[in-house]
Amino acid sequence: MAVNVNTNVSAMTAQRYLTSATNAQQSSMERLSSGYKINSAKDDAAGLQISNRLNVQSRGLGVAVRNANDGISMAQTAEGAMKETTNILQRMRDLSLQSANGSNSKADRVAIQEEITALNDELNRVAETTSFGGNKLLNGTFATKSFQIGADNGEAVMLNIKDMRSDNALMGGKTYQAANGKDKNWGVEAGKTDLTITLKDKREGDVTISINAKEGDDIEELATYINGQTDMIKASVDEEGKLQLFTDNNRIDGAATFGGALAGELGIGAAQDVTVDTLDVTTVGGAQESVAIVDAALKYVDSHRAELGAFQNRFNHAINNLDNINENVNASKSRIKDTDFAKETTALTKAQILSQASSSVLAQAKQAPNSALALLG
């Protein structure tokens, strides 16, 4: 082996391995201290891109869960207020039935009407003041809003909260008053027993109801017979013996038309719009009509409460799914980006040993040219 002074190949080789070991040691220390095996694009360019996309998705899923929880909270707030609306309407119905009883005097009914009016004011106050995050929920201004429950655009769900004010048309219906009252001595005449009611059901379309009363039926029996034949229209009789008919705006679209001999004899009038806001229980007829109006309002409120309950259940399932997706996304990201401490500590130990060995060899290699001095000696 030649003895060289100008070029120390052994030292150069030792220096190269020392540099490599030092770089490996620094890389291992960076991975262990940060907890990530990918700290820059040079570590793994493809892995960095994939892990960043997964991180974006994970953060989006986290926001979606928060959005869904906000949606549940909003629906719970609205539904909770609507529960009180239901309680108010039930009390109104009780009072209407009480007022319809013959044992009450005019003064009694006026007193009952005062409570009806107070309850109506409270129902509207609930509708006007129920809010969530500054958004009024029940006064008709909320309309429809979207809730982003996904990590990407286009993954929104619409929520509609309806108007719960007492003057809302869907909190009532249409009433029809007969012009001709009938006393207890009146009875359905032979050949004049037919009554036809034509209306448009929102679910079934145009419907014609044929009522064939029995000869001799009085006005109360006629009302009972009508109620027994269909649930699309409610019949009652006021204190003057006049037939009253009511259709629910939630089910019937537009006004009903009446035909047949009985329609002409009774003189059934044109439709009048009525809502909870117009309840008047100061008469027997008004009290009877109020029961039908409140029943329609209760159906409307309860139906929307059911919709909000379904919305909450849907969002609960959405949150469960989002949490599951987020868990799997983070597991994938962890496998790509996170440091395997067992593996990396082994690599660090190896790099430290090689670094120390290379340093020792380099020190010895630097002494090799000194042997040339012995030859000159």
UniProtKB/Swiss-Prot annotation:
Known InterPro entries for this protein?
Flagellin (IPR001492), Flagellin_C (IPR046358), Flagellin_C_sub2 (IPR042187), Flagellin_hook_IN_motif (IPR010810), Flagellin_N (IPR001029)
Where is the major localization of this protein? secreted
Disulfide linkages recorded for this protein, renumbered to the chain, are none
Q: Which residues form a coiled coil?
A: 103-129, 301-340
Question: What cellular component GO annotations does this protein have?
Answer: bacterial-type flagellum; extracellular region
What Pfam families does UniProt report for this protein, alphabetically? Flagellin_C (PF00700), Flagellin_IN (PF07196), Flagellin_N (PF00669)
Question: What keywords would UniProt list here?
Answer: Bacterial flagellum, Coiled coil, Secreted
Which is one GO molecular function term here?
Answer: structural molecule activity
Q: Does the keyword Isomerase apply?
A: no
Could you tell me where this protein is found in the cell? Answer: Secreted; Bacterial flagellum
Q: Which residues form the signal peptide?
A: none
Q: How does it assemble?
A: Heteromer of multiple flagellin subunits including FlaA, FlaB, FlaC, FlaD and FlaE.
Question: Per its database record, what is this protein's job?
Answer: Flagellin is the subunit protein which polymerizes to form the filaments of bacterial flagella. FlaC is not essential for flagellar synthesis and motility.
Further comment:
V.cholerae is able to differentially regulate the flagellins within the flagellum maybe to produce flagella which are particularly suited for motility within a given environment.
What family is this? Belongs to the bacterial flagellin family.
Q: Which NCBIfam families match?
A: PRK08869.1-1, PRK08869.1-3
- What is the designated name of this protein? Flagellin C
